[in-house]
A protein has these predicted regions:
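Proteins that catalyze or organize thiol-disulfide redox chemistry
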Residues: 1-161
């Protein structure tokens, strides 16, 4: 805002130009203040993967398992566009899903074994395990996918009553 005033609203500027530059600078300052005081979004309700917990929940509850890593740009893209906290809260509410995040930033033999068991070797991968006997055949979304593709995969689950 100060730079704008120095460039376009200085002593030599016309009255109309000073008014426009001042209004624009004020708008920028107010917008910056408003943006900075917005509350942080509630984080997504992910649980950290533990093989024993996963095995105990399988077949008993519907699960959505996300395989990710800090070094994976495609994973980060999905987190920012498809797997947003707002969408994940709505999904868990609608389907009663438990969300489990498998972090492969560091080697984890049990997590990598699960990744191979669903037929994948690379990430990102999201696997949806229905409740009951169908959990033996998870719905798998590989690489990049859209929110509508995720919704289509979830549509095979029964909404929570």
């Amino acid at each position: 805002a100060a730079w704008m005033w120095g460039q376009w609203g200085g002593l030599r500027a016309s009255g109309r130009q000073k008014l426009f530059t001042g209004a624009l600078a004020l708008l920028m300052v107010c917008g910056s203040i408003w943006w900075s005081v917005q509350p942080a979004p509630e984080p997504a309700p992910w649980e950290t993967f533990r093989a024993d917990t996963f095995r105990s929940l399988l077949k008993k509850e519907p699960l959505m398992v996300e395989f990710t890593a800090d070094w994976c740009p495609s994973c980060k893209f999905l987190e920012q566009t498809v797997l947003t906290p707002k969408r994940l809260h709505a999904i868990t509410e609608r389907y009663g899903l438990r969300l489990i995040k498998v972090d492969l930033t560091r080697p984890d033999p049990e997590a990598q074994a699960l990744l191979r068991a669903i037929g994948s070797v690379s990430i990102p991968v999201t696997a949806i395990f229905p409740k009951g006997l169908l959990s033996n055949s998870p719905i798998v979304l590989r690489d990049l996918y859209t929110a509508s593709q995720l919704e289509d995969a979830l549509a095979t689950l029964s909404p929570r009553k």
